[in-house]
Amino acid sequence: CHAFTGPGGGAAVTTAEEGETKVGRFKLLYPGLYVYHCAAAPVPVHIANGMYGLMYVQPEGNDLPPVDKEYYVMQSEFYHEPPEVDDDGRRSEIVEFSYPNGLREEPQVVAFNGSESALTRDHPLKAHVGDDVRI
């Protein structure tokens, strides 16, 4: 679900030309966790380049029960061409975006919170027995 409703999800208000500044105000009517992304065309290319994130709208009065731990998890998908082979025979670490793979929604990599092993090896979600946890 998107954070903003209406034509283009607020794109007309939030789209700025190079060198231009815009300010938009939105009344957040529905509490919840939402995805936001830029609205510049072509949207799949911008999303593939990381122009998205999460927006948490708390209920009025913050009437959610208190918890010991709270975690936010965002899935990312990366659509790229096969890596080129460098002169030394190793695969390049730089890959090129694949528009066809993006249109087909066939990711070559799926990551959480922006990187491989982000929620396991590098930054595991931790809690103690008996903790109340919100994910």
Positions of predicted regions on the chain:
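Acidic-aromatic/histidine active-site loop/patch
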Residues: 69-129
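Histidine- and aromatic-enriched segments that form or immediately flank copper-ligand environments
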Residues: 1-57, 107-109
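Structural beta-strand segments of beta-rich domains
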Residues: 131-133
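Residues embedded in well-ordered secondary-structure elements
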Residues: 15, 27, 44, 62, ...
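Solvent-exposed, flexible loop/coil residues
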Residues: 8, 16-20, 59, 82, ...
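A short beta-strand/turn structural motif
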Residues: 48-61, 86-93
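Polar interaction faces of repeat-based domains
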Residues: 63-67
